[in-house]
């Protein structure tokens, strides 16, 4: 069980996007390409990678969690070096990206050009 108001090294990202393609194509791409390639990448510090669509399926949100800032750095570097970004750009328009947790300066510099905003821990708990 976690401790109350005890910060962890965990880092979370929320990327909200609008769809540029139809919902069926987006869902198929999410399952067959994005989730599959990320899962197969076996990034040790990536804890979760979950896509969601809004009720009318015009917007998508990707939520990721990492053990620490280094996990986000590895994820981002792998993403930029892989085949997914051009495919992603054809299907989605990034509306905003939020990063939560204690993020190292080099990672902030890496992610900021993509419009990320950064949020530090203020209080709460995590039982996992």
Features from the language model and the residues they span:
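Short S/T/G/P-rich N-terminal loop/turn motif that feeds into the first structured element of a domain
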Residues: 1-60, 67-78, 90-128
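A short, acidic, amphipathic alpha-helical segment used as a generic capping/interface helix at domain edges
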Residues: 80-87
